[in-house]
Every structure is written in structure tokens, then in C-alpha cells.
């Protein structure tokens, strides 16, 4: 338990300092490691590192109360609604994922001052500026969002469940919960870690080696779940 508390404390300190944290969800779920960093600290070199060392999709996970105020909805609901016009879209949303629940994807955005939106610089700007929207959500943030962003774009937004870990144990909820523990804006950039040798998700052992090499805290979902229960 002491080791878990130390690991959690290290992860919180790293996020506060604008450094990466690696988050493992659960071997019975996706069993994947995400490289994450608080949105308010994102710089272009962070996106470059996520792109090169993680290799998955760079997304922005945001707390539910913020996405609700912005009027954002889950992509699977948008697609299902399109099924009223074209029944094929209803088929696309049938069933659940192999790991058990629906994805947390919403729309993908670009900041209006970006060019293509996909470069490290552009994605970092979009994420950082979206963190400002989240910070100002009750003070002009909604208008700021509508005025300064466009969709579709290159930064997918992930909507966290309302009660976070009490509703869902995905990386979206785990990472937004981590921002709350760190007293940061509840918006966090996340990217799955891939293995170019096996062409699968990076194993926990390989992630531990990477974390040790670069001095990055690696935290497991069980530690966050235990903390949430104790709170």
C-alpha cells in the first residue's frame, strides 16, 4: 500500500510539473498503457514525443460537466442519430466494444489559428487553447469555444463519465480523475502506447522499462480505484 501511495504521489507531482505519466487501465479491460500529460502544460515537443514514443491516437479527455456545458455529445450518439436518415449508421453503433463499453469519443477539433491542424505545433495549440476554454467554462468559455474552434479537426475529444471511476474504468475517466487529484484543469492529453516490434499494444513490462529509462511515473488503474473508494 505504501508503494502504491508513493506511485500515486509521484504521478500527481509529475502532472503538476508538466511532465508525462503512464497510465495502465486493467488487464481485464483494454490492458493498454497511455502516455498522458495535463492539457494546460502541453507544448509541441510533448506531441512529438507522444507521436514517436507512444504512437497511438492523441486525444483530449475532458470532464463531463465541462463537455455538457459545451453541448458536446458522444460520437456514437451522433452516428446513431444519423441512422434516422440512413439505416446503415444504426448498424455501425450496434453492440459494444470487445472491452465491454462504448467509446468515449465525441467530435474532433482544430483551433482556428492552426493551418492543417495535424502538426505537433497545431495539435499542441488546439489542446492548450481547449484547456483555457475548460478553465473559463463559467466565464465565457462556451462562447470562446464556439468562436475559436472548428470541426472536424485533428484532436478528438473524449467525454469522461459523470461519476468518473464509479461509472467507467476507461483511460478517459482514469486520467481526468488524475487531474482532479492534482488540482489541475480537468482536461488531459492522452495517447496509447504501441509496440512497433509486435504490432500490438505495448506490454506492461515494456512500459515499465520505458518509464524507468525516462524517469516517468507509471500508475495502475487499481491505485486510482483504491484512492477513489477511500475518498
Predicted features and spans:
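Catalytic domains of riboflavin
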Residues: 1-231
